[in-house]
Design a protein with these regions (language model features):
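The feature captures the beta-strand-to-loop junction immediately N-terminal to the Walker
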Residues: 41-43
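Short beta-strand immediately N-terminal to the Walker A/P-loop
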Residues: 38-39, 85
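Conserved ABC ATPase "signature" region
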Residues: 72, 107, 114-132
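Helix-to-loop junction immediately C-terminal to a conserved catalytic motif
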Residues: 56
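Conserved ABC transporter NBD signature motif
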Residues: 64-71
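Short coil-to-helix segment of the ABC ATPase nucleotide-binding domain corresponding to the Q-loop/switch region
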Residues: 96-104
Length: 132
């Protein structure tokens, strides 16, 4: 995936929002490019979690569209979006090996398996876990 576009996204947990304060997420129109490092910052209750849930497919926005590399994925289910979130405190999947934990984000991005293997082995060397 090369780009995520938020095309005039808004969300309300009210069935028929009529006032400005009914919107959990005010209109967002933004683009993220592949390879960038981004932080989503703001005070409690400003809509950060709502936005992440919309991008990942856990919520469908009340208004607007989400595009992954130009493709409208607004109505796609979470499993069909091929996206994962990396949180401030990353999770290690205890049902996966160290190798598979390192390979997981690369595979989610559709990196060819030969390149996944190369990058994972390089990373294991860097952190002195190649023998494990």
């Amino acid at each position: 995936m090369a780009r995520i576009d938020l095309d005039h996204i808004r969300h309300s947990y009210f069935p028929h929002p009529t006032a400005d304060e009914h919107w959990a997420l005010k209109e967002v129109h933004h683009q993220w490019e592949d390879g960038g490092a981004y932080a989503l910052l703001g005070p409690s209750g400003c809509g950060k979690t709502t936005l992440l849930n919309i991008i990942s497919g856990l919520l469908i926005p009340s208004e607007g569209r989400i595009l992954f590399d130009g493709k409208d994925v607004t109505a796609l289910e979470t499993r069909d979006r091929n996206i994962a979130q990396v949180f401030q405190f990353p999770v290690i999947y205890d049902t996966m090996t160290v190798y598979d934990n390192l390979a997981f984000p690369l595979r989610n991005r559709g990196v060819p398996e030969a390149e996944v293997d190369k990058k994972v082995r390089e990373t294991l060397e860097m952190i002195d876990l190649a023998d494990w």
